[in-house]
């Protein structure tokens, strides 16, 4: 491992390890009572919870498969691999968290786990991600030519900028907004930890993409730039459709039009993070509290159940 070529990758591995958490540490009692009471949640709120658990339980498996079957094999730098292994563990924890929520709330598992086949707005997102992992997950796929190197780059953009960087944001915002209104606070706390992990995954992926561009400038030609921008725009459109489908009437403090603006704001960020121009002019962030959660550091979380920045693994420095 030493000397490190990419200090940023090792630092993210250390930070991710220090932020370790497990789903069963979070109390789900209030969520269970609320979910089972007849007038606890509106039908629209129930739809939001079920759709998101259905999408996320499938999506994190998709991300984990891509990491283990493709990226770990194709990215050979030791400290980047170390972080990819850390991320793989976190994806397993996230899948565990969704399962824990589904079981705690006594949901119909068949209904939830089949959404990626039966609910069109969920299915479209899952199949969009699959098309970018299919070829590079093949054990015979090798990088080393301009064409295959570009395929790897497209996979990184698809999974880090779009799947984790856009497809997760409507659902995170919906669930965390419910938590802010003191509804489904256990589920929202699980999602808060997951969002913190996912933010680091996205940052790692963007660092890898930008490092590949620096070391292989010939890959980042006009055609590739146009394709990368197109992928981010396609992902944004799919997520806007998902927002409209999960919020046909809106819920307190949030509706599909606000979510559309937020997703365009996020898309602009993803574009600029990989060196492309913003595509949506004049959009702002209608949910500034989301940025506060993503950037939360060393303070008690807004559900006041436990310290969000609690760390394990000897990461505290004693004076």
Can you say where each PLM-predicted feature lies in the sequence?
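Non-heme di-metal
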Residues: 38, 42-319
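Amphipathic alpha-helical packing elements
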Residues: 1-36
